[in-house]
Amino acid sequence: MSDQKQTREELLERMLKGYQAYFDIERYEEREDDLPLMAHCRFYVHSEKYVLVKKAKLWDADSNEYVYIFSVPELTKEIFEQCKDYAYEEGMKLIDPKPGHMYSYITPVFICDTCTKEAEKALMRCRIYKSFHFSWYGWMNVHTAAVIRKGNRVITNRMGRGNAKFMKNILNS
């Protein structure tokens, strides 16, 4: 698709359609705090292994991902920091580090028309990792991603590279 054919609203709809098969989605119309949050997606998985009967459990593991989708005309460093901090704080409230918790990902995703160099640099260099009880109760990573309409680009931080393929499919389909 050529440069900037899809609007941010169309990209948001395509993204939510891609997430809806696996994630619980909560949409936001307009917020009192003027945060450009459009949707919050939650993913939960519980796995366990047992022998013969469920009482003879060998292990169990909980995995979670919390995606916060923001939409802005221009992504600046200030907007990035404000939204990233919000996603981190809200995501940490949802994490329950306990025996059996393996990992949780907090993923702020930005849909924007343009992105400043400072914001791009901050997004790509974002590294937030937290281990709970020396990783006995799991860990948390922050994955960041931005879908930039100008130039049909997708950028992520190192931990968010797994999301890049999904985002590129959304942008180019």
What do the PLM-derived regions correspond to, one by one?
Residues 1-72:
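N-terminal, charge-rich interaction modules
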Residues 53-56, 91-96:
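Short, charged beta->alpha transition segments
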Residues 63-66, 103-107, 142:
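Short, surface-exposed beta-edge/turn micro-motifs
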Residues 69-74, 110-113:
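Structural motif
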Residues 75-89, 93, 117-121:
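Active-site-adjacent loop/helix micro-motif of nuclease/hydrolase catalytic cores
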Residues 98-123:
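Nucleic-acid nuclease catalytic cores
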Residues 125-173:
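Charged, structured surface patches that assemble and position nucleic-acid processing machinery
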